[in-house]
Regions:
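Tryptophan-anchored aromatic micro-motifs
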Residues: 13-32, 103-109
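Short, solvent-exposed aromatic-acidic interface loops
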Residues: 52-58, 77-81, 106-113
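Short hydrophobic/aromatic-rich beta-strand segments that constitute the beta-sheet cores
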Residues: 22-23, 47-49, 71-75, 101-105
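A short, polar/proline- and glycine-enriched secondary-structure boundary/capping micro-motif
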Residues: 58-62, 82-88, 112-118
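Mid-chain, well-packed structural core segment of small domains
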Residues: 67-99
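N-terminal amphipathic/basic-hydrophobic helices that include classical n-h-c signal peptides
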Residues: 1-12
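Edge beta-strand at a domain terminus
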Residues: 34-37, 108-124
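N-terminal glycine/threonine-rich, aromatic-flanked beta-hairpin/loop signature
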Residues: 37-64
């Protein structure tokens, strides 16, 4: 990728750094609790977060963000049963009238039953 294109990518994408997201809804087969908080960190086009709460004792996500702010994510976590669970997620941002971001997520477990689900997160 030419340097100009790489710089343009960095300046046009959504900056998720230090944004805090809370779950609004989650599919029944998910482990995310509605009381959890996700604090995103971003360096370049890489987004990360550590999280815990509810049924999750410890979790980590890593994602690549594209020019439209979409996240291509992988996550792994330890649940309250002591199991390591893993998955993939595609997150699509929606800009709200108040300037905040709502994330529409479609995910799939890559461990266990391989089931799919959807979540909705919103920036605090």
């Amino acid at each position: 990728m030419p340097i100009f294109s790489a710089l343009r990518l960095l300046f046009t994408m959504i900056n998720y750094n230090n944004k805090v997201f809370v779950p609004l809804s989650n599919s029944e087969n998910g482990e995310v609790d509605l009381s959890m908080r996700f604090v995103y960190q971003q360096t370049g086009n890489i987004v990360t977060s550590t999280y815990s709460g509810g049924r999750i004792r410890a979790g980590h996500l890593i994602a690549l963000v594209d020019e439209q702010g979409n996240l291509d994510m992988r996550y792994h976590q330890v649940n309250d049963k002591g199991e390591i669970t893993t998955g993939i997620c595609k997150s699509t941002p929606e800009q709200l009238p108040n300037g905040k971001i709502r994330m529409h997520e479609k995910w799939q477990w890559t461990s266990g039953d391989q089931s799919e689900g959807e979540s909705l997160l919103e920036e605090l």
